[in-house]
């Protein structure tokens, strides 16, 4: 059955649901950003991780430059970490943001979400940056291109607030503490 021309968003959605498409869908559910693309388009890290305009411009290049059917403006996995009390280093232009301080790493630390949660989460400047970049992309593409977001689950968030090594070791050494972490972080929007 022949399918007529589709918008990138229609193509992505059809491919995702197993429906016929007008051509194979070219998409990535993760970031496609690399140094060559940053040089070509202009925005670089760290600005593209901390400022919604450069973030959106760099994300848009997945479609505008490379022809992908989707764009995704969140380039790393640490955006939520700051909202959960981590100190994240966004300064290295050659690397993705990295948590430098994990509030639950100390074995005596109380495993609980930050004061004011969930409102404080949505007001965090890096969470807002990501949401603003998505809004900018929506204005730029309208309903033509699939705009993807990224949400980390409790396991990945635990790496940030707990410390990766300690968290993984505690899956055996202190599984109750791991469960408390996963339970607390399951409330993150």
PLM feature spans:
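Active-site-proximal, glycine-rich beta->alpha crossover segments in alpha/beta enzymes
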Residues: 83-188
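N-terminal basic, low-complexity leaders that serve as flexible interaction/assembly modules and, when applicable
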Residues: 1-90, 132, 180
């Amino acid at each position: 059955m022949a399918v007529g021309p589709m918008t990138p968003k229609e193509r992505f959605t059809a491919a995702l649901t197993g429906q016929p498409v007008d051509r194979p869908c070219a998409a990535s559910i993760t970031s496609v950003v690399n140094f060559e693309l940053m040089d070509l388009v202009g925005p670089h890290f760290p600005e593209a991780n901390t400022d919604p305009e450069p973030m959106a411009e760099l994300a848009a290049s997945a479609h505008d430059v490379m022809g992908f059917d989707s764009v995704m403006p969140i380039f790393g996995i640490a955006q939520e970490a700051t909202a959960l009390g981590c100190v994240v280093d966004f300064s290295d232009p050659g690397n993705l943001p990295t948590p430098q301080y994990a509030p639950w790493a100390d074995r005596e630390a109380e495993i609980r979400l930050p004061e004011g949660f969930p409102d404080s989460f949505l007001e965090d400047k890096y969470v807002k940056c990501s949401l603003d970049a998505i809004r900018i992309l929506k204005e730029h593409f309208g309903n033509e291109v699939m705009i993807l977001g990224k949400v980390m689950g409790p396991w990945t968030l635990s790496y940030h607030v707990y410390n990766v090594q300690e968290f993984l070791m505690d899956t055996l050494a202190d599984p109750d503490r791991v469960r408390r972490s996963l339970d607390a972080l399951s409330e993150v929007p």
